[in-house]
Amino acid sequence: YIGLKISNALQVLRGEKTIGIKLNEVSQSYPVYVDGIPYIYKNDNYEIQMKQMIAEFAILANSFVGEYLKLNLDGKGIFRTCEAKELLSNMYNLSGNELLNEIIMNGIQAEYLSQNRSHDLVGMPEYSHFTSPIRRLSDCVCHYLLKYIYLRKNDNNLIIPFSNDELNILSNRCLYAGKNMKKIQYKDIKFRLIHTMFNMLLTREDITLTYFITSYSGLFLNLIICKIDDHDVHMSYTIRSRKFNGEINNHHKSVKITKVKCLQTYDEGCIPELERHILENP
């Protein structure tokens, strides 16, 4: 209970600096497997509160470490940044889901830098990734730098473990690895959601998909499936077409589908009724 009160207070403080806290309103459903059978699950209120509490404490720790590195290493280190204050300033009246859609449409993304910059989505002037050294390289680098700062108090001749050039290289590697892992994660989510939809259609006639279109290159039409029936989800999907002449915006459209096919190398053909609906009703 005390932890929840503290995390709520931290969220209020962040809310004075960023509209990014509205993303806490977004609670997406996800596939879970029971005895090998997938179904779609939505966290209950208690689970949502616990996850938000953990997230707030992680943000506090990451921002504290980011500031500590900046102050003790003359602004150098490895920082998680997202300079988007100007874009975000036009989105104050949006809901959490609407904000998420705008972030996707505008390509707002965080990156890693070896020089400190603000992270406007979390509302912090300094921010690092520190809390997960088991799974992220950037967090390991932060731990090495913190250890160096601690040890040099007793040894002024101690050499910093990474040069400025090495920190820059590591930042770029972290950025590349992070993007690569997200691609893998998106494919994994897509596979599991398609598997879940297939399983749902074994016991019912249809399901309703809600989607919006994010971009069109002249060949590849990219969209986000944001709802399966009443479940909020986030699933990217790409269709190949040279004849699309519809609008590119985050206006939601819906379609009922009665079948899905196994995910292949490309998305095309997995949800044929969705593809036909989009191309025939641009």
Question: In which residue ranges do the predicted regions lie?
Answer:
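Electropositive polyanion-binding surfaces
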Residues: 1-244, 251-258, 263
